[in-house]
């Protein structure tokens, strides 16, 4: 991985997993097909600013919306995405793919920032702790 010097990734994992109902979040993987999401009205990831989680960008030059944790209430709920998946609606995999790609783009940006700041070891430790917490 990155700690060993790998600096480029080319993989279908984010899109394939999204189409099959597995979504990546800061706190672990979320399986949208799980019945517990049927009535869950929070976004996939409350810290995420992608279109699926946070809705439309704020402002004309914004590239992302406002996360749930930052007070935003746009985006789509886990319950709605669960419903889209269960009924085979094409919007479901489109939104989940947007989310997974945003997650990976943001993760790589955070890693580059940590490397530039000489804080990759701290970033890596926090990343592992967050993922171990669970969704």
Feature map (PLM): residue ranges:
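Alpha/beta catalytic cores of nucleotide-metabolism and tRNA/nucleoside-modifying enzymes
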Residues: 2-135
